[in-house]
A protein has these predicted regions:
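Short, solvent-exposed loop/turn segments at secondary-structure junctions
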Residues: 10-13, 87-89, 113-114, 150, ...
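A long, amphipathic alpha-helix that forms part
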Residues: 29-78, 113, 136
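Histidine-centered active-site microenvironments of extracellular/periplasmic hydrolases
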Residues: 70-125, 138-146, 165, 171, ...
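Polar, surface-exposed loop/tail segments
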Residues: 76-77, 118-181, 249-250, 257-266, ...
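C-terminal, low-complexity/hydrophilic appendages and adjacent surface loops
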Residues: 99, 169-253, 302-308
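Long, internal low-complexity/basic segments
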Residues: 103, 219-236, 241-247, 251-318
Length: 318
């Protein structure tokens, strides 16, 4: 009987950096080299060591799932997909539209060793994953899916661009969008009065986050690290990701890249017009759009069809 199962592992989640702070480490903090947007101190290296140790524990949990599939005699018939839901769990990673927050690991294991060792350098988005899973099952993705399959029978054309947005995160209202091609990332800040850093209460449990805030208030952070806490100096940002992987140098005013700015700005505006029409709405305006007059819209109920003994099919247009 075909099966589809999803397992979510929390051990490598942001919150586990402080919740598992006293667990044994598999890497010594002194061996950690923090990225340039983090202060290189004992607190930072310690939290990074916890994060890496959490990933090690997650790897062991993944192995347990694989062993269960093997013991059930299904390993040679099962496609295993593993990926994360955002970039790194550390400050200036999760929730950010930079590479540190949007680049995620993604691995596929086919039962016959197909494509083993292959590295796919094409651009993909999360919306591509459901369509890809259907394609792997030889099912044509429905028209209402925006995703492009990148594996399987219905594999589509490679993307030239990928897009991102952040607006309502935890208890914070923000408004940013981005577009990335094979080399450059363009970011638009719609609330330039806000800094990149957001005071998210749960994240302030992380010792490293507490330390960064304290150092910034004392003027002890270097230019690269403190930039995250300051108001964006520009409404627009452009980064050469290939040559500046941590996206520390904003090229938006460099005339040598004016054509890239114009091209990516146009792509961003076209994407917003098509997929992000409520971008500029206030909370009250958005609520009225979703629930006119404060009334919850009634959606079409699902349809259940009996397809065989002990089998039903549930369909819904919404």
């Amino acid at each position: 009987v075909p099966f589809f199962a999803i397992f979510n592992m929390e051990v490598s989640h942001e919150s586990q950096v402080w919740k598992r702070a006293n667990e044994p480490l598999v890497i010594h903090p002194d061996s950690i080299i923090p990225p340039p947007y983090h202060p290189d101190d004992e607190t930072t290296r310690r939290d990074w060591a916890v994060a890496y140790s959490n990933i090690h524990e997650m790897d062991k949990q993944v192995q347990q799932f694989i062993d269960e599939v093997d013991e059930a005699g299904l390993l040679d018939e099962t496609i295993i997909i593993w990926y994360s839901d955002n970039g790194g769990p550390m400050p200036r990673q999760k929730r950010e539209l930079y590479e540190s927050g949007t680049l995620v690991p993604f691995m596929v294991r086919f039962p016959d060793g197909k494509l083993a060792g292959m590295v796919d350098n094409d651009l993909h988005m999360f919306v591509d994953i459901p369509a890809t899973i259907l394609s792997l099952a030889n099912i044509l993705p429905p028209d209402y899916m925006h995703g492009i399959p990148f594996l399987g029978k219905f594999k589509g054309e490679s993307r030239n661009y990928v897009y991102g947005a952040r607006d309502r995160l935890d208890e914070i209202v923000e408004r940013q969008t981005c577009v990335r091609d094979g080399r450059f990332r363009y970011v638009r800040n719609y609330l330039p009065e806000k800094s990149g850093y957001m005071e998210i209460l749960s994240r302030l449990n992380m010792p490293m986050m507490q330390n960064m805030v304290r150092l910034f208030k004392r003027g002890k952070l270097n230019k690269e690290t403190s930039r995250w806490f300051e108001k964006p100096p520009k409404i627009e940002e452009l980064y050469d990701v290939n040559n500046d992987p941590h996206e520390m140098k904003n090229l938006i005013d460099n005339p040598a890249y004016s054509k890239e700015v114009e091209r990516l700005r146009g792509e961003m505006e076209a994407w917003n017009k098509c997929y992000n029409p409520y971008l500029g709405l206030t909370e009250a305006e958005l609520r009225e759009k979703l629930w006119p007059g404060g009334e919850q819209p009634i959606v079409e109920p699902p349809v259940c069809v009996k397809t065989g003994t002990n089998k039903i099919q549930v369909k819904s247009n919404t």
